[in-house]
Amino acid sequence: QLEKGDFVPSGYELKFGSGKIDRIDTCEEENCVYVKVTDYKTGMKSFDITALYHGLQMQLPVYLNAAVHVEEQRHPGKEIVPAGIFYYRIQDPVVPAEDSEEAVEKSILKELKLDGLINGDEAVVAHLEHDLSGASVLFPMGRNKDGSLSKSSRALPRETFETVLKYTKEKENSLKEAMFEGEVQAAPYEMGESTGCDYCAYRDICGFDLRIDGCSYRRLEKFTVEEAVAAMWLTLEENGFGSGGEQG
């Protein structure tokens, strides 16, 4: 990652509130600083923008918002550009031993490829990986023959990417307000095959049981990326936020 791009580590295990950002990388230019965050994972967790919309997977964008604030303090007067949010697997990948050395290396790189979401601004892409051609072995992105980003790229236009971060702030604030107001009822969600009870430490004592009348899951809708972003825009507009993220 360091050899193929311009980002360099600027912080490890940075604590804020009760959270901890595993790694912050930055790329500094004369008038701006690009920043991305990486969270190390031992499992196969992947970023799900639908889960973010519903307030279930907010860690990475919350971390990036915090990292942007940190870099604003470090670089007063410079524009801080959020570049990406990533999960990185730290466990050793298992690949077929009978493969050639080149095939083994490709398999390892594929298994260790970052997962997440990228600010698709061309300046960001160029700083992440020089001379990107075809599918990247490092980031969830690739280029078509005409130079455009491929449809499979996990990248959003800059304004859309920043909308995701603005929505995250708004969602975080609304969840905090709900908790402060005492909303603690057991109302687990169901989305696809997952539920809020799957890994809940309190499932045996909360009193929620589908066999009891009145107990049912809150069914959350799955969205495409485009649908999730549109829903985020709508929420921001309903709450009085314009395209610049300022409340009216």
Question: Where do the language-model regions lie?
Answer:
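Structural signature of nuclease core domains in nucleic-acid processing machines
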Residues: Q1-G248
